[in-house]
From Swiss-Prot:
Subcellular location(s) per record: Virion
Keyword ATP-binding (UniProt): no
UniProt-listed SUPFAM superfamilies: Baseplate structural protein gp8
Record bears the keyword Flavoprotein: no
UniProt similarity note: Belongs to the tevenvirinae baseplate structural protein gp8 family.
Role noted for this protein: Putative baseplate protein.
Signal sequence region: none
Annotated protein name in UniProt: Virion protein 3
Keywords: Viral baseplate protein, Viral tail protein, Virion
GO CC terms in record: virus tail, baseplate
């Protein structure tokens, strides 16, 4: 079996990162899971979230890699769970072997309908109706949801108008590996 080279992983990460203009966080699944304490494993054949509540334009996308102590003076560093990652500029992607992508989005108050949700995902190539410049979109504002690139099933989360939801993702281009928080 052939393997992907490190440079091909950086290339794939750059391709994804360059979709930022059409990249949106999606939240959905308002109805309960069969077992609320144990959401089902995500199905890789899924093409859209269940019961989409809305979409929010991502705020930040960057190449990244595992943190090294020497990074503090060279590049920005972000925390993801209990781990640190270094944000790498595109021009240094190959040199730094940055084959991960950091994605950050924020939903503030009631810019999308409030209430419970159980799924989050990242869409690329989303097309809004009438070239809308809005950053928060309802499903009715969307002509084409594009490609659901990544998603996660979760236990119930509740958003109220007083809550700021900040979602961060580290997407790795390595096969059969995911980054745990």
């Amino acid at each position: 079996m052939a393997i992907a080279t490190n440079n091909s992983r950086v290339y794939a990460s750059l391709q994804l990162k360059n979709k930022q203009d059409s990249m949106y966080l999606a939240i959905g699944k308002t109805t309960p899971w069969t077992n609320e304490d144990a959401p089902p494993a995500p199905d890789p054949t899924t093409t859209t979230l269940t019961e989409v509540i809305g979409y929010k334009k991502v705020a930040r996308v960057s190449l990244c890699r595992e943190y090294l102590p020497s990074d503090d003076s060279k590049y920005p560093v972000v925390s993801y769970g209990s781990r640190k990652f270094t944000l790498i500029p595109d021009e240094d992607g190959y040199k730094e072997q940055a084959w991960m992508v950091y994605v950050e989005a924020e939903i503030t108050g009631d810019e999308l309908p409030t209430g419970t949700f159980r799924q989050v995902g990242i869409h690329t190539d989303l097309v809004s109706k009438a070239s809308s410049e809005k950053k928060a979109l309802l499903p009715t504002d969307v002509t084409d949801a594009g490609i659901l690139q990544f998603f996660e099933n979760r236990q119930q989360q509740n958003r109220t108008s007083d809550v700021i939801l900040k979602e961060k993702f580290i997407i790795t281009m390595e096969n059969k590996k995911s980054v745990k928080q």
